[in-house]
Amino acid sequence: ILRIFHTELEAVYEEKNRSLDSDGSKVFEALFSELFKNHNYGQQTTIGTVEHLKNPSLVEIRKYFNNYYVPNNMGVILSGDFDPDMVIAQVDKAFSYMKNKPVAKYTFKPETPISAPVVKQITGPDAENLTMGFRLPGNKDKDVLIADLVRQVLTNGKAGLMDLNLVKKQKLLRASAETFTLIDY
């Protein structure tokens, strides 16, 4: 697998470069870095840092693979028109070499409450926009359902408060409210 690593790394590097040129990606990264100072959500993007990509450690990559790419830490999702018995047999055969092993639970220092507004400015070629973020509880918390209901009242593409009062009255080109909840926050 590692023999094709460098060609894959080039593709990942190109994806990282695209994100560095994207105002939206820069805004999202800045938002998460401010909301999650302790959690990995705000420490780096999924694709990693430029430094990680410049100096990859094959030893660390192999270690990560061996620790986390285990059957009890993954799922196989299939869709389409196929014979389930045949496909399950193929999946079983393809992954039969893998053995279950304990996977350490992710731990992190809880975030401190946000006590004052945080303002970050991102510069780039895109049109000006405002992004506001709020740290919510994890996706298993019932308050997240309330946050999603508020989102739908604000914007739903047709008759949300922001849709009617800002977009349809042409006060703004676009306005949206989104809930982006993850496991821990």
Positions of predicted regions on the chain:
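Short, glycine/charge-rich beta-strand/loop segments that flank catalytic centers
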Residues: R3-E14
